[in-house]
Amino acid sequence: MTVTVETLEKLERKITLTLPVGTIQSEVDSRLKKLARTVKMDGFRPGKVPMNVVAQRYGYSVHYEVMNDKVGEAFSQAANEAKLRVAGQPRITEKEESPEGQLAFDAVFEVFPEVKINDLSNAEVEKLSAEVGEDAIDKTLDILRKQRRTFAQRAQDAVAQDDDRVTVDFEGKIDGEPFPGGKAEDFQFIVGEGQMLKEFEDAVRGMKAGDSRTFPLSFPADYHGKDVAGKQADFMVTVKKIEASHLPEVNEQLAKSLGIAEATVEGLRADIKKNLEREVKFRLLARNKNAVMDTLVANAELDLPNASVQSEVNRMVEGARAELKQRGIKDADKAPIPDEVFRPQAERRVRLGLVVAELVRANNLQAKPEQIKAHIDELAASYEKPADVVRWYFSDNNRLAEVEAVVIENNVTDFVLGKAKVKEKSVSFDELMAQQG
């Protein structure tokens, strides 16, 4: 087959396809005969429906299917022969004029671009590092102790203070009117932990069991309850019970309750450090990977195929609809979500995907089986039964493909960091944990 490719735009191409009418009709006849052997129609026994009746009933739909199949096959063959990397689906239209005995079609489509990655030795990448110090272990230990704290009722004349658990009744009104969520009975919270707004905690702090108090409270403008955000309410609160919190001692008993294999204080701290170091490793990898990807995008030249961008936009819109549906939003499938909201992010994803694919191809950065296995082992190490987790990953090709994609990204990250000008920056454990992504 001689294939003539016409360039319309930067990435847009056109191929004219021709198909013999006889080939189309022969396939239509073949499919109708096959259909006639099994079709059921009133007034006829199965397999005994006359061909002209079958053709009258199903001829149009079968002809449509055959045309789709044959044109699709012809396009795939033509694109392969022309060594074209097609992006998205072609737009195929039948030509008004065709050679005798032929049907002619124009297929307009986009191809994937050539990707030029500039010399990475001139690129700069900031690489973060962080250590797990004793203070991070202490803070984690405090969190674990708080999760296992107990409470004991305080004396009748005791006043509420930080770390106490208080049980209260309260009711709030705005302009003298109650509002949804503004009233509760036997509500418990820990003073000083920020579960309640600061003005609420300040009002309760210093009260005794049995005391009541009224106070004004201003809801922040960005408060999650949109109906009350930015408004001022008047609250009445009554303290019913005050309980002091008691943290467990850091000892062998605490270590044992946490399931530490070496049930000693030293073993507990060592286990915490190991888990924190694993978390630090993954966070650093994610953050440094993002920095590398930003550098790649900034140092690559390519045109974006609109078909790929639109496909990614569609995927993101559907994802947004699914999230709305999960939140219980009515008619989420009909929610007006404009494509343009997601287009910049979709363009970046497509651009990054093409650049990474080219870097992987040009530098043989594909994931090796032993790398995939090592990554799964590392993921499984934090679970109680690592062997079960490993089997879970290897039992599903989709899960393996996800791991393979992560390993490829890690290979790309290591490759770029080995080529670029790396600026090392040390951050504290808390700074790293506070960073997004």
From Swiss-Prot:
Alphabetical list of Pfam families matching this protein: FKBP_C, Trigger_C, Trigger_N
Entry GO CC: cytoplasm
Annotated ranges, domain PPIase FKBP-type: 163-248
Main location: cytoplasm
Domain of life of the native organism: Bacteria
Enzyme class, spelled out: isomerase
Alphabetical GO biological process terms: 'de novo' cotranslational protein folding; cell division; chaperone-mediated protein folding; protein transport; protein unfolding
Catalysed reaction, written as an equation: [protein]-peptidylproline (omega=180) = [protein]-peptidylproline (omega=0)
Enzyme Commission number, as recorded: 5.2.1.8
Function recorded in the entry: Involved in protein export. Acts as a chaperone by maintaining the newly synthesized protein in an open conformation. Functions as a peptidyl-prolyl cis-trans isomerase.
UniProt domain comment: Consists of 3 domains; the N-terminus binds the ribosome, the middle domain has PPIase activity, while the C-terminus has intrinsic chaperone activity on its own.
UniProt-listed PANTHER family: TRIGGER FACTOR CHAPERONE AND PEPTIDYL-PROLYL CIS/TRANS ISOMERASE (PTHR30560), TRIGGER FACTOR-LIKE PROTEIN TIG, CHLOROPLASTIC (PTHR30560:SF3)
This protein's name: Trigger factor
Species this chain originates from: Variovorax paradoxus (strain S110)
Higher taxonomy: Bacteria, Pseudomonadati, Pseudomonadota, Betaproteobacteria, Burkholderiales
Gene behind this protein: tig
